Swiss-Prot record:
InterPro entries: DUF5466
Highest taxon, organism lineage: Viruses
Protein name per the record: Protein 19.3
Pfam families assigned: DUF5466 (PF17554)
Length: 57
């Protein structure tokens, strides 16, 4: 019983590795998008603050 289970587990591991790679690529793309969005929002807030701060001074 142990011999036929090994190749099945190996094939499942290969499939899981492929799925994990796809998920990792998706996660990396999502993280990059979120980082870009956060950076853009931060720059927008800083520009607004500078625009508010400059006329006061």
């Amino acid at each position: 019983m142990a011999t036929p289970i090994r190749p099945l587990s190996y094939s499942l591991r290969r499939q899981s590795n492929g799925e994990s790679r796809r998920l990792s690529t998706r996660v990396t793309s999502v993280t990059v998008c979120s980082v870009r969005y956060s950076v853009l929002s931060f720059l927008n807030t800083t520009t607004v603050r500078w625009k508010r701060f400059v006329p006061v001074v």
